[in-house]
């Protein structure tokens, strides 16, 4: 099979599109023919050298994987040839206390796909059945590649960690990015009032067309908390969703009302943020870190995408051969939602959706 291998990380990463052996199916696993794989900021951070710890040499990146089952192990149950499926974000043993407690994404034996073990920037991938979620036949595999991440990741952050409920106010920063644009939809589906911010004027209309709530341009010098308090009758937000990280950390904190929660995810660069601790103390506020998604979050995301509650946002489909162009586009910050890669030969040119 053909696979895209990261040969050298750095400001200008180097890749090789190489021919390697097809993967073999495990006793209790499947081989998935990869139809689409999203490019996550995690992938970008490995490409540019920011993330190094635990990264496999000559790694095949990609953890946002959707495809079709083309081989099934003799002990594999609940899935058959031709079924559509998405992978989890990490491997897991399925047997330890952590896995049995529903926290398989924290399995001590886990390896991140496209990080500690090879991922989906290839024509095929072999995974165990417990690291796979079956899709409905009618589902589009391009959009489905975003189900585990970013959609499942935002489901975990908002449903489980923040416990968003109907009538609450949720502020979403970075709402034009992969995490933000789906978090806004998840929050809206939970009945929350969504206030979304983006720094990109060209994303405003497209965000508004998704119909999840109010969208504002975060211009230089604007304090978003002034707007948030004006829109919430001076109560402040119940939740601030912050996938941007340190750059808006203090601003997001100021948006919170009493007992508010800020969930932070996405940023892995290790940047520091200056914070007025009193802003947290006198709000009885909470700051929650979040990463990953479990089977139940991915299954929830599948149901919401299948029913049309959440729309996967794909800016462009690009062939493996255009990985450097995809990298540059994502680094520019101009991508709305995600770029999805298509295995070599299945797509010969970039297509906007």
Language model features: what each stretch is:
Residues 2, 33, 66-68, 193, ...:
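Residues located in well-ordered beta-strands
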Residues 21-22, 56-62, 113-117, 123, ...:
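Short Gly/Pro-enriched turn/cap motifs at secondary-structure boundaries
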Residues 22-37, 50-97, 136-139:
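Glycine-rich beta-strand-centered segment in the early N-terminal region that forms part
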Residues 35-37, 74, 90, 104, ...:
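Short, surface-exposed secondary-structure boundary micro-motifs
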Residues 93-174:
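NAD(P)H dinucleotide-binding glycine-rich loop of Rossmann-like/cofactor-binding domains
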Residues 139-221:
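Mid-domain Rossmann-like dinucleotide-binding core that forms the NAD(H)/NADP(H) cofactor-binding site
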Residues 162, 195, 205-288, 346-353:
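Glycine-rich cofactor phosphate-binding loops and adjacent beta1-alpha1 units
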Residues 250-253, 295-353:
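C-terminal hydrophobic helical "lid"/dimerization subdomain
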């Amino acid at each position: 099979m053909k696979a895209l291998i990261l040969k050298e990380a750095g400001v200008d990463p180097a890749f090789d599109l190489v021919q390697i052996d097809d993967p073999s199916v495990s006793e209790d696993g499947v081989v998935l023919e990869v139809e689409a794989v999203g490019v996550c900021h995690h992938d970008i951070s490995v490409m540019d050298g920011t993330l190094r710890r635990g990264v496999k040499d000559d790694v095949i990146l990609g953890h946002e994987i959707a495809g079709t089952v083309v081989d099934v192990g003799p002990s594999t149950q609940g899935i058959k040839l031709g079924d559509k499926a998405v992978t989890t974000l990490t491997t897991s043993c399925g047997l330890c206390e952590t896995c049995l407690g529903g926290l398989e994404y924290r399995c001590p034996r886990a390896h991140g796909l496209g990080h500690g073990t090879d991922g989906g920037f290839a024509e095929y991938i072999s995974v165990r059945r417990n690291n796979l979620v079956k899709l409905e036949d009618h589902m589009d595999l391009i959009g489905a590649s975003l189900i585990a991440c970013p959609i499942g990741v935002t489901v975990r952050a908002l449903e489980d960690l923040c416990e968003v409920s109907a009538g609450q106010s949720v502020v979403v920063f970075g709402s034009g990015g992969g995490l933000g644009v789906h978090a806004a939809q998840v929050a809206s589906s939970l009945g929350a009032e969504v206030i979304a911010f983006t720094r990109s004027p060209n994303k405003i209309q497209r965000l508004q067309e998704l119909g999840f709530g109010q969208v504002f341009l975060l211009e230089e010098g604007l304090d978003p908390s002034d707007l948030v308090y004006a829109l919430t009758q001076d109560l402040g937000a119940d939740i601030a969703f912050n996938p941007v990280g340190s750059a808006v950390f203090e601003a997001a904190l100021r948006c919170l009302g009493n007992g508010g929660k800020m969930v932070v995810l996405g940023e892995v660069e290790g940047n520091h943020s200056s914070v007025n601790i009193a802003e947290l103390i006198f709000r009885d506020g909470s700051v929650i870190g979040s990463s990953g998604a479990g089977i139940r979050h991915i299954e929830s995301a599948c149901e919401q995408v299948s029913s049309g509650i959440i729309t996967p946002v794909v800016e462009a489909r690009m062939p493996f051969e255009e990985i450097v162009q995809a990298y540059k586009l994502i680094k520019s910050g101009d991508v709305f939602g995600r770029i999805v890669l298509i295995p070599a030969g299945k797509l010969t040119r970039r297509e906007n959706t």
